[in-house]
């Protein structure tokens, strides 16, 4: 039988861990001075006035490369628990993981052909 009172500690932890950052922002907003001047509104670059355009734009290739990295990083997060319990899960879990890896390999081939992995 599923009993909700068994999760009291979980809910208390969730509420407290959600309230701490909120309270930190609230208290810092209340205690901080509200003085806006030219120094406050200027760009800060290691204590030195910025020279030239302070806004640097990255090329789109970097974003594509980072996106492919994130996809395969998430793949590792999903496959690690599967690898740790491989002997317990059986053949059906192996087939599911194989299909998952196959889809990711197809995505890698697609990204490779589209040039997402070319840095130049």
UniProtKB/Swiss-Prot annotation:
Membrane topology term: Multi-pass membrane protein
Pfam families: Oxidored_q4
BP terms from Gene Ontology: photosynthesis, light reaction
EC number: 7.1.1.-
Superkingdom, taxonomy of origin: Eukaryota
Uppermost EC category: translocase
InterPro entries: NAD(P)H_OxRDtase_bac/plastid, NADH_UbQ/plastoQ_OxRdtase_su3, NDAH_ubi_oxred_su3_sf
GO cellular component, one term: NADH dehydrogenase complex
Molecular functions (GO terms): NADH dehydrogenase (ubiquinone) activity; quinone binding
Membrane spanning stretches: 9-29, 64-84, 88-108
Reaction(s) catalysed by this chain's protein: a plastoquinone + NADH + (n+1) H(+)(in) = a plastoquinol + NAD(+) + n H(+)(out); a plastoquinone + NADPH + (n+1) H(+)(in) = a plastoquinol + NADP(+) + n H(+)(out)
Subcellular location: Plastid, Chloroplast thylakoid membrane
Keywords: Chloroplast, Membrane, NAD, NADP, Plastid, Plastoquinone, Quinone, Thylakoid, Translocase, Transmembrane, Transmembrane helix, Transport
Family that this chain belongs to: Belongs to the complex I subunit 3 family.
PANTHER family: NADH-UBIQUINONE OXIDOREDUCTASE CHAIN 3 (PTHR11058:SF9)
Subunit structure: NDH is composed of at least 16 different subunits, 5 of which are encoded in the nucleus.
Summary of the function given for this chain in its UniProt record: NDH shuttles electrons from NAD(P)H:plastoquinone, via FMN and iron-sulfur (Fe-S) centers, to quinones in the photosynthetic chain and possibly in a chloroplast respiratory chain. The immediate electron acceptor for the enzyme in this species is believed to be plastoquinone. Couples the redox reaction to proton translocation, and thus conserves the redox energy in a proton gradient.
Name of this protein: NAD(P)H-quinone oxidoreductase subunit 3, chloroplastic
Lineage of the organism: Eukaryota, Viridiplantae, Streptophyta, Embryophyta, Tracheophyta
Gene, per the UniProt record: ndhC
